[in-house]
Amino acid sequence: MLKSISILFLAIIMAACSTTPEKKVMIILVDGVPADVLESVDTPILDQIAAQGGYTRAYQGGGKDEYTQTPTISAPGYMNMITGVWGNKHNVWGNSVRNPNYNYWSIFRTVKTVNPEMTTAIFSSWEDNRTKLVGEGKPEAGNFMFDHSFDGFELDTIAFPHTTDRSFMFNIDENVSKGAADYVRTNAPNLSWVYLEFTDDMGHMYGDSPQMIEAVKGMDNQVGRIWAAIQQREREFDEDWMVVITTDHGRSEDTGKGHGGQSERERTTWIVTNQNSLNERFENNPPVVDVAASALRFLNIEAPTEIREEMDGIPFIGDVSIMNAKARIVGNELAVSWDVADKSGSVEIYQSSTNNFAKGEKDEYSLLGKAEVKEGQFKTAFTFPTGTTKLLLKAPHNWTNVWVIVE
């Protein structure tokens, strides 16, 4: 009897001492690699990561010919990813990053605000990702500061002399990927962003070419360094890592040298992840804005309500109820529709006739009505004011939003 009690006591103690693996997220953005090019190149590291989770074609550029349309240019593409919203909200339209709207928080700011104990890091071949897009240290960006940054090497022309063949950018990417791998091994931040540029340089210089193919192979090797460090952390520490690799835009249809427009090839991107709890959203051409929402879900971070109301992305891991919401005016009626992912429960549809959030102020939402998720639609009589009407759909597993604009 005493022996049984001792064994039971030991089991209780061991259970109490066991811990849930600590969540970590690594987001890697490689510049300017269209889906068709990636799929044509031997990338053993990306293939290995996808074998654990999945690979899907995705898209940049927002809704074509819609209010969310965003240029397929680098900085807007990065901002789409780190904020989970399109250009009509974050206001980044080109690489000059003239007037970003920091009221739409980066994922890094959200994580630090909700859980200040979590650590963040950036490893980047373009310093503006930290200083302009995230807005590190800016009052208007909440005075957010990374716990660790490893960037600015493109400004160091002594260590990385600038050459016309752009090989110095490959060397910078090498340095950045090694720096990221080393820091992950020793510090393992909760949320990290790695940015690698050289693939886009080769695309601009040579288009669809052997040089572009070799650049993609080199990128795969660089990702491999980081992946090896993550695998080591998972083996040696009680950690659970989500890895997401994606790109900021495709390339032009004709030569592959350009981008920025809304052609199918410029819009078509991809996502690789090691996660195996992928949902219907992942399998149906997800937008890049889903990356932020997915990372937050993995980290068990719920964004503040006013941020969550604005996010355009939907998690591609775990349960989701609705996606691809659309709204239109039919006579004197408002018609809202959505694609059904999980039929259970109901959708609450709210509206606001203001867009005060864009100015850092609050929008008041009123309930228009409810519908069963499985119905996939909601209609109601509605008098539309001139300007923007914001619609917020709250379903059991996720929220989403859509605008109606009356000129």
Segments from the language model and where they lie:
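Metal-dependent active-site segment of extracytoplasmic phospho-/sulfohydrolases and closely related
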Residues: 27, 45, 218-260, 295
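Aromatic/hydrophobic beta-strand junction motif of beta-rich domains
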Residues: 333-342
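Catalytic-site neighborhoods of secreted/periplasmic enzymes
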Residues: 88, 92-93, 99-164
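Substrate-binding rim/cap in mid-to-C-terminal beta-strand-loop elements of soluble/periplasmic
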Residues: 77-78, 82-85, 260-301
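Polar, surface-exposed loop/tail segments
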Residues: 286, 299-333
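Histidine-centered active-site microenvironments of extracellular/periplasmic hydrolases
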Residues: 245-274, 404-406
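Active-site His/acidic residue clusters
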Residues: 135-138, 150, 178-221, 225
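Short, structured active-site-proximal loop/turn typified by the sulfatase FGly-forming signature C/S-X-P-X-R
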Residues: 36-73, 121
